From Swiss-Prot:
Its EC number is 5.4.99.25. It catalyses: uridine(55) in tRNA = pseudouridine(55) in tRNA. Belongs to the pseudouridine synthase TruB family. Type 1 subfamily. This is tRNA pseudouridine synthase B. InterPro entries: PsdUridine_synth_cat_dom_sf, PsdUridine_synth_N, tRNA_psdUridine_synth_TruB, TruB_C. Signal peptide: none annotated. It is an enzyme of class 5 (isomerase). It comes from Alkaliphilus oremlandii (strain OhILAs) (Clostridium oremlandii (strain OhILAs)).
Length: 299
């Protein structure tokens, strides 16, 4: 079984808990998620199954969309409402000042990842060190906030939708907004509404998954999140060359290679998605596709 499930992770479960549920349901080991969602957060968690685990990096690299609630006037050790309160301050900013501060984060900005995170430094996850009372210096990371829409500002609460790059911590965004306003802030609610091409309206709950007799009925194809990529469709006569990982020349294809040098493409054998390639150039300026990864299972 190969494909992707769009799971609605409930609060209270880790992303790995969801993977374990799917493994047990399918009686398969080759199952993986595509980007950790905080245990207390809910939302879209695409789960790759079988050969689809080989494309998980493409999903990890995709944009994410969240609905979040920021509570101003509080600072905690975890940067969310569930942590130990370190400091409380009065919120004196007006709604207009709050709006301006929130929207000022649109674009690229440098984040320092929270100590309570799954990032590994020298083989240790940061949250493991944090639980031991150890805090270490973390390098800044550049993230991108593509869009923010403020839904509501009510007293110290701000509800907003945010579209962001991979690796963006919404907890840290909330903390940073609070710092700009001089009162501190924490994330008090988080729902991931989209991850790459997967959205909340097509996600299924754990209960719905458990009730299914045939999971393949809702399994999405491996190339579902890759529709933005160019396709190189190989004629069936050249199947052996493709499956052996040989170079793919224009005459092997239904259509010629139009993509520029260095562009990655999805490789199909007729209608079957079989892997990834990259456009290269020979010395005599003949383009070809070099196979980067094959997804088929050898028999």
């Amino acid at each position: 079984m190969n494909g992707i499930l769009n799971i609605l992770k409930p609060p209270g479960m880790t992303s790995h808990d969801v993977v374990s549920v799917v493994r047990k349901k399918l009686n398969m080991k080759k199952v993986g998620h595509t980007g950790t969602l905080d245990p207390n957060a809910a939302g879209v968690l695409p789960i790759c199954i079988g050969q689809a685990t080989k494309i998980s990096q493409f999903l990890l690299d995709g944009k994410k969309k969240y609905r979040a609630e920021l509570t101003l006037g509080i600072e905690t050790n975890t940067e969310d409402i569930d942590g130990e309160i370190l400091r409380q301050r009065e919120v004196t900013s007006s709604p207009d000042e709050i709006r301006e501060a929130v929207l000022s984060f649109i674009g690229e900005y440098k984040q320092i990842p929270p100590m309570y995170s799954a990032i590994k430094i020298k083989g240790k996850k940061l949250y493991e060190l944090a639980r031991q009372g150890v805090e270490i210096e973390r390098a800044e990371r550049t993230v991108t906030i593509y869009h923010i829409e403020i839904i509501e500002i009510f007293k110290e609460k701000v509800i907003f939708d945010v579209l962001c790059s991979k690796g963006t911590y919404i907890r840290t965004l909330c903390k940073d907004i609070g710092e700009v306003l001089g009162c501190g802030g924490v994330m008090s609610f988080l729902l991931r509404t989209a991850s790459s091409d997967f959205s909340l309206d097509t996600a299924i709950t754990i209960e719905e998954l458990q009730a299914l007799e045939n999971v393949e009925d809702i399994l999405l194809p491996m190339d579902y999140p890759l529709q933005h990529m160019s396709k190189a469709i190989v004629k069936s006569a050249y199947s052996k060359q493709v499956l052996n990982g040989n170079r793919i020349y224009s005459n092997y294809l239904i259509d010629t290679i139009h993509e520029p040098i260095g562009q990655e493409v999805c490789v199909y054998l007729e209608k079957e998605f079989v892997g990834f390639g990259i456009v290269r150039n020979e010395d005599h300026n003949q383009k070809y596709i070099k196979i980067l990864r094959l997804l088929f299972e050898k028999e």
